[in-house]
UniProtKB/Swiss-Prot annotation:
Gene that encodes the chain: sucD
Class of enzymatic activity (EC top level): ligase
Organism classification: Bacteria, Bacillati, Bacillota, Bacilli, Bacillales
Active site: 247
HAMAP family tied to this protein: Succ_CoA_alpha (MF_01988)
Positions contributing to substrate binding: 159
EC numbers for this chain: 6.2.1.5
Protein's name in the database: Succinate--CoA ligase [ADP-forming] subunit alpha
């Protein structure tokens, strides 16, 4: 088991003929992801990396039976690309694109109300179920199949946590990058719920950062509902107030959203928080050992 994606996920790539999309399409295919088509308006009938290209998402879905899409469309056109995928009734849309205007995403969120599609991102590294399916831009080779779920607002911190776990012989069920923008499709709680219900996930690492209250809300949810151990990390301890730190959502405003505040809430909700990024894996392994879960989480 895993969450959101597996070896049977049938993927289309929106914006497939762009250089970034072509590079990552090749990487995803090499990993074993089942990419069944691509979409670039005006390029229908051609091929990219051996994958058929269509003019519209609807046409691609109708022809290939795709149930998921990954979007590498430039920011000014990305919101339209998401809505086109939602209109085509895909189960899952993963948007990698950064710098989508916030107002565009507000419109997308409203458009998606009551629709069946789950959006992950934007401004995210994607989702990977190790040794089955990789959708996005993460380096596949650092992942190992196993029982730890990873959910994060940061791409590179996800890779850091995953690499530490894999090096210690602890595999992952699924790693989900929810993205660093203030308005996104899937939040921490959505992913934690999925991990909680997944029999193959035995523990979770949640990686947050300054800005907003998503981590605090997730911690309260964990305290009330989670049956599996969760370990946390919060980036941005030394960030000055009022300065955006890399991600559009990573900003301390009005004294709210500081790392200290978040860490305090996580601790109060029973979530052990790693002091620095370099001990994220170590902190989880310590908790696994305390709960006698380490052996079941080791990849044999």
């Amino acid at each position: 088991m895993s969450v959101f994606i597996n070896k049977d996920t049938r993927v289309i790539v929106q914006g497939i003929t762009g250089s970034t999309a072509l590079f990552h399409t090749k990487q995803m295919l090499e990993y074993g992801t089942n990419i069944v088509g691509g979409v670039t308006p005006g390029k229908g009938g051609t091929e990219a990396e051996g994958v058929p290209v269509f003019n519209t998402v609807a046409e691609a879905v109708q022809t290939t039976g795709a149930n998921a899409s990954v979007i590498y469309v430039p920011a000014p056109f990305a919101a339209d690309a998401i809505m086109e995928a939602v209109d085509a009734e895909l189960d899952l849309v993963i948007c990698i694109t950064e710098h989508i205007p916030v107002l565009d995403m507000v419109k997308v969120k409203r458009f998606m109300e009551g629709k069946k599609t789950r959006l992950i991102g934007p401004n995210c590294p994607g989702v990977i179920t190790p040794e089955e399916c990789k959708i996005g831009i993460m380096p596949g080779y650092i992942h190992k199949k196993g029982h730890v779920g990873v959910v994060s607002r940061s791409g590179t911190l996800t890779y850091e946590a995953v690499h530490q776990l894999s090096e210690a012989g602890v595999g992952q069920s699924t790693a989900v990058g929810i993205g660093g923008d203030p308005v996104n499709g899937t939040n921490f709680i959505d992913v934690l719920k999925a991990f909680n219900e997944d029999p193959d996930t035995h523990a979770v690492i949640m990686i947050g950062e300054i800005g907003g209250t998503a981590e605090e809300e997730a911690a309260e949810w964990v305290k009330a509902n989670m049956t599996k151990p969760v370990v946390g990390f919060i980036g941005g301890k030394t960030a000055p107030p009022g300065k955006r730190m890399g991600h559009a959502g990573a900003i301390i405003s009005g004294g709210k959203g500081t790392a200290d505040e978040k860490i305090k809430t996580l601790n109060a909700c029973g979530i052990e928080v790693a002091e620095t990024p370099s001990v994220m894996g170590e902190t989880l392994i310590k908790v696994l050992k305390e709960k006698n879960l380490f052996e079941t989480c080791k990849t044999h």
